[in-house]
Amino acid sequence: MNNSNGSAAPTVMVVEDFEDNRFMMRRLLEMSGYRVLEAVNGQEAIELAHRERPQLILMDLSLPQLDGLAATRRIRQYPALRDVPIVAVSAHDTADFHADALAAGCNDYVTKPIDFDQLEALLRRLLPKNSGQ
């Protein structure tokens, strides 16, 4: 997928176990010109990130099998993925959750329900300037 200016669309990985939430995020991101990868749990996120090298990861913190914090820590162990921005996504909006996400290696934090205008501004800030957006 290319943007209207001909550059490749930035790839965003959505890690979310609830299908309706994944669908909504994918549709909104695709409508904004992003290429979207999807994972349903932390282990799948690690494998997909290692294989596909997304330019940004939206990581739900409450995931089956391997939670988002543990998955983030493991993703950060791969040298090629250390600089990929990871945004924690959670329904919990407390200082402890924010601190835990940052300590695990997340770059930022958004709460559910997601305000897409806020998310879009965050993506523009965190994505590399040459990523096509």
Feature roles, as predicted:
Residues 64, 82, 94, 113:
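The feature encodes the CheY-like receiver
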Residues 16:
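Conserved acidic carboxylate
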Residues 1-13, 117-133:
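Non-catalytic signal-transmission and effector/linker regions of two-component phosphorelay proteins
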Residues 33-40, 48, 110:
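Short hydrophobic/Thr-rich beta-strand motif most characteristic of the beta2 strand and flanking loop
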Residues 52-58, 63:
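Active-site beta3 strand of CheY-like receiver
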Residues 23-31:
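Charged docking surfaces used in two-component/phosphorelay signaling
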